[in-house]
Amino acid sequence: MFGSDLYIALVLGVTLSLIFTERTGILPAGLVVPGYLALVFNQPVFMLVVLFISILTYVIVTYGVSRFMILYGRRKFAATLITGICLKLLFDYCYPVMPFEIFEFRGIGVIVPGLIANTIQRQGLPLTIGTTILLSGATFAIMNIYYLF
């Protein structure tokens, strides 16, 4: 998926996330995350790496950084994003297996683990991961139907 497919997947993911959030009150790890993960839904290794970094970010911020700093609101969100970005960059540096097709998604992919970790802090792990995978799969399925026509 290149070019306009990126925009279509992100807009579709945001739309599905917004509808789902309005209906259920459950936020699927931020509005842009399901659209982004739908772009790599057929690459389970990449999805697992993003989820692993997200959980690691949550653990570091909740049980590490918050012991030394008072974190709430914007400070907590900023700490989560910075930790997620640093872990993603460190992981990319230490484990540089990145297929060419998803290279262009690295920019937005740096933010996604922090967004997922921030939502895990608010809603819990099972609810966040479950709804995110559900909506990513729905976005992926709709994009595949879009490709047929």
Curated annotation (Swiss-Prot):
Superkingdom to which the source organism belongs: Bacteria
GO cellular component entries: plasma membrane
InterPro entries in the record: Capsule_biosynth_CapC (IPR008338)
Membrane-spanning ranges: 1-21, 24-44, 45-65, 129-149
Subcellular location, principal: membrane
Record's function text: Essential for the synthesis of the polyglutamate capsule of B.anthracis which is one of the principal virulence factors during anthrax infection. May form a polyglutamyl synthetase complex together with proteins CapA and CapB. CapC may be the endogenous acceptor of glutamyl residues.
Topology class, membrane: Multi-pass membrane protein
Cellular localisation: Cell membrane
Keywords for the protein's UniProt record, in alphabetical order: Capsule biogenesis/degradation, Cell membrane, Membrane, Plasmid, Transmembrane, Transmembrane helix, Virulence
Biological process per Gene Ontology, one example term: capsule polysaccharide biosynthetic process
Upregulation: Capsule synthesis is transcriptionally regulated by AtxA, AcpA and AcpB.
Biological or metabolic pathway of the protein: Capsule biogenesis; capsule polysaccharide biosynthesis
Protein's recorded name: Capsule biosynthesis protein CapC
Signal sequence extent: none
Organism: Bacillus anthracis
UniProt keyword annotation of Transmembrane present: yes
